[in-house]
Design a protein with these regions (language model features):
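Conserved ABC transporter NBD signature motif
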Residues: 60-73
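Catalytic Walker B motif of ABC-type/P-loop ATPase nucleotide-binding domains
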Residues: 150-154
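ABC-family P-loop ATPase nucleotide-binding domains
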Residues: 83-141
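ABC nucleotide-binding domain signature
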Residues: 35, 77-82
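Conserved signature/switch motifs of ABC ATPase nucleotide-binding domains
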Residues: 144-147
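A short, flexible loop at the N-terminus of ABC-type nucleotide-binding domains that lies
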Residues: 1-23, 30
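The feature captures the beta-strand-to-loop junction immediately N-terminal to the Walker
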Residues: 37-39
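Helix-to-loop junction immediately C-terminal to a conserved catalytic motif
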Residues: 52
Length: 157
């Protein structure tokens, strides 16, 4: 089994006084489900944002499937941010089409199957859904990719 994520000597902070990671080293093998636990402000979201390329480490390296974080790694990572980010005026079916166009590994059948199981009508706009159903749609979209790494930031918050 190969390593999915390799983090080596990572340093990350905010400003001069807030160091989040000093010398972070971490190896995550394929085929595992890993949860990050810790109090608010402990660096969970910072680590997630570095994994998906939204933040850069000051020092050290992060490799996913052998590649530095960048276009090659983004092609194999499916990311669920902590906040809903979809345009509320889109129909869910339009969202599926956007994901299908944008991600080569998006499985449209999987998305519609999950919607059916959760009684979510793909012809509804997101605006008409409850907050919980909006979050379910976002999770469906992320999990309908055939990614090698799923990164979920506060999926059950």
């Amino acid at each position: 089994m190969s390593n999915l994520v390799e983090i080596s000597g990572v340093k990350k902070g905010y400003g001069i006084s807030k160091t989040v990671f000093e010398d972070l080293n971490l190896v995550l093998p394929e085929g595992k489900i890993i949860g990050l636990l810790g109090p608010n402000g402990s660096g969970k979201t910072t680590l997630i944002k570095m994994l998906v390329g939204l933040l850069q480490p000051e020092k050290g390296s992060i490799r996913i499937c052998g590649h530095e974080v960048g276009p090659e790694s983004k092609a194999v990572v499916s990311y669920l941010p902590e906040r809903t980010y979809f345009n509320e005026y889109l129909k869910i079916r339009q969202l599926v089409n956007m994901f299908k166009d944008f991600y080569a590994d998006f499985d449209e059948t999987r998305a519609y199957d999950m919607m059916k199981l959760l009684n979510i009508d793909p012809d509804m706009t997101l605006k008409k859904l409850s907050k919980g159903n909006k979050e379910k749609v976002q999770l469906i979209m992320v999990m309908s990719r055939r990614a090698r790494l799923y990164v979920l930031d506060e999926p059950i918050a």
